[in-house]
Amino acid sequence: MSLKQITISTLRQWKLANKKFACITAYDASFSRLFAEQGMPVMLVGDSLGMTAQGHSTTLPVSVEDIAYHTKSVRRGAPNRLLMADLPFMSYSTWEDACKNAATVMRAGANIVKIEGGGNWIFEIVQRLTERSVPVAGHLGLTPQSVNIFGGYKIQGREQSAAARLIENAQQLEKFGAQLLVLECIPESLAEQITKTISIPTIGIGAGKHTDGQILVMHDALGITGGRPPKFAKNFLSGAGDIRTAIQRYIYEVEQGLYPAEEHSFQ
């Protein structure tokens, strides 16, 4: 099956046209091929694999080698989709580490690397990677690699000062070269404000319906996450009959603005 190549420029065009798009995590060739065949434009090899595939309680144990291995697999299944890959915990704490590890992940097949957080040191890394032809996606709000700082997986940006800081960080990430921005577990109104403030596409997870795109961990989208699912998750497999139909439903509901609904969002 021949599929149109999806690029960062594609997502920028969609933002300008107010066209919503879906994204999903993927970890192997079988699922990435299935997702691509249903029209999924963007996939993420996330460090969430530490929890979903490896059984850890956080994303912190995931290594660059883990990400590279799964990126190669996902790329084989979805050669024409836009593929993001996380730089995992402590893999970009120095410029030398960021450069080496980003190169490893890009060689494995990623189109863009994602790093978490804001602040001057992050902005410098984003700028230096971008200058060396490595596209970077930022990630603000609930950044799972900072779980021990946050004291758990908690909503971010509810206080006025925290919201202002997130807006400033989003603007700075764009200024220093970030191509995309993931917004996780922040109030819907704040995500809307950030999306309107910056020109790069935003991708939300638990950030309401006003971001340019939406992303879900595949296990959440298919209702196979252990324990209680997060508030923002929806089981698209329920009532669908098969995984292909479930993924088609997810894509359709995002594109039509039906998902996320109010019950999946934080106010």
UniProtKB/Swiss-Prot annotation:
One of its GO terms (cellular component) is cytoplasm. GO terms for biological process: pantothenate biosynthetic process. The keyword Transferase applies. Gene3D superfamilies: Phosphoenolpyruvate-binding domains (3.20.20.60). One of its GO terms (molecular function) is 3-methyl-2-oxobutanoate hydroxymethyltransferase activity. Its EC number is 2.1.2.11. Pathway: Cofactor biosynthesis; (R)-pantothenate biosynthesis; (R)-pantoate from 3-methyl-2-oxobutanoate: step 1/2. Keywords: Pantothenate biosynthesis, Transferase. Coiled coil: none annotated. Transmembrane segments: none annotated. The keyword Transferase applies. It catalyses: 3-methyl-2-oxobutanoate + (6R)-5,10-methylene-5,6,7,8-tetrahydrofolate + H2O = 2-dehydropantoate + (6S)-5,6,7,8-tetrahydrofolate. InterPro entries: Pantoate_hydroxy_MeTrfase, Pyrv/PenolPyrv_kinase-like_dom, Pyrv_kinase-like_dom_sf. Belongs to the PanB family. This is Probable 3-methyl-2-oxobutanoate hydroxymethyltransferase. It comes from Schizosaccharomyces pombe (strain 972 / ATCC 24843). The lineage of its organism: Eukaryota, Fungi, Dikarya, Ascomycota, Taphrinomycotina.
